[in-house]
């Protein structure tokens, strides 16, 4: 429905009473008026249209994604991405679909360098046109002046490499989002709850410089790997 949030349409008790006619006893939202087109979908996102990981200097040109069971383009841990005439769009006025992707048209996680999107069209997606973000780890334990145990906290953000030796990071106080201390560099990072990075939620991280005394697990500190320096929509 135009200019509204998602409508909740419970499927419990829905019965077909005649061909193409259904009784939905729990559809009681006042915005569901006769003539309203309802696009039913799940919130699962099993696969993006295009997936990039650990790539460098990638260029996607004259590409159209008309539908995907997730993001249109999902990129993680990449450096320098150019989208020229890259579109997430319907096939035209006669396209029978009402939406293109289950979530964002394009989504960039923990990328670095320059992200350039030009001459494209993003329409019909169920969330953002362009979403660019890093990924925080929360400090769970301070082992010494150089080493911490840190953990992915969001259920959709784990199982991929958070950082590598030499990466620059910044500490952030979670309650206020204020920067704390200066930047530091990763000397060593190892999965702590798994034998491999795949599936790991916790890391043991040793830093090159001593940590500020106030950085502990008591108040809730996170750290963000330094990501994309330039974004051009």
Residue ranges of each PLM-predicted region?
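Acidic/polar low-complexity surface segments
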Residues: 1-46, 85-108, 127-157, 162-232
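Repeat-solenoid scaffold signature
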Residues: 110-124
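All-beta strand scaffolds that present successive hydrophobic residues in beta-strands
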Residues: 57-63, 80-86, 114-118, 233
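Glycine-centered loop/turn positions within well-structured domains
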Residues: 71, 81, 128
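Extracellular beta-strand-rich solenoid/capping regions of secreted or surface-exposed proteins
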Residues: 44-56, 70-78, 105-109, 228-233
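Phosphate-binding glycine-rich loops and their immediate beta-loop-alpha structural context
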Residues: 50, 63-65
């Amino acid at each position: 429905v135009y200019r509204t949030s998602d409508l909740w349409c419970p499927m419990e008790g829905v019965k077909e009473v005649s061909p193409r006619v259904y009784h939905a006893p729990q559809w009681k939202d006042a915005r569901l008026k006769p003539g309203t087109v309802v696009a039913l979908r799940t919130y699962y996102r099993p696969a993006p249209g295009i997936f990039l990981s650990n790539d460098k200097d990638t260029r996607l040109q004259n590409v159209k994604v008309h539908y995907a069971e997730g993001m249109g383009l999902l990129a993680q841990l990449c450096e320098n991405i150019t989208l020229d005439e890259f579109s997430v769009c319907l096939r035209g006025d006669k396209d029978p679909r009402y939406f293109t992707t289950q979530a964002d048209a394009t989504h960039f996680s923990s990328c670095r360098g320059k992200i350039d999107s030009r001459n494209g069209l993003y329409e019909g997606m169920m969330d953002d046109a362009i979403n660019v973000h890093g990924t925080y780890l929360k400090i769970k334990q301070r082992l010494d002046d150089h080493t911490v145990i840190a953990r992915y906290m969001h259920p959709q953000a784990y199982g991929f490499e958070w950082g590598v030796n030499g990466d620059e990071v910044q500490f952030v106080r979670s309650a206020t989002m204020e920067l704390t201390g200066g930047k530091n560099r990763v000397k060593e990072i190892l999965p702590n709850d798994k034998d491999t990075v795949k599936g790991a939620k916790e890391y043991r991280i040793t830093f090159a410089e001593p940590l500020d005394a106030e950085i502990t697990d008591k108040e809730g500190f996170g750290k963000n790997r330094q990501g994309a320096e330039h974004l051009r929509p």
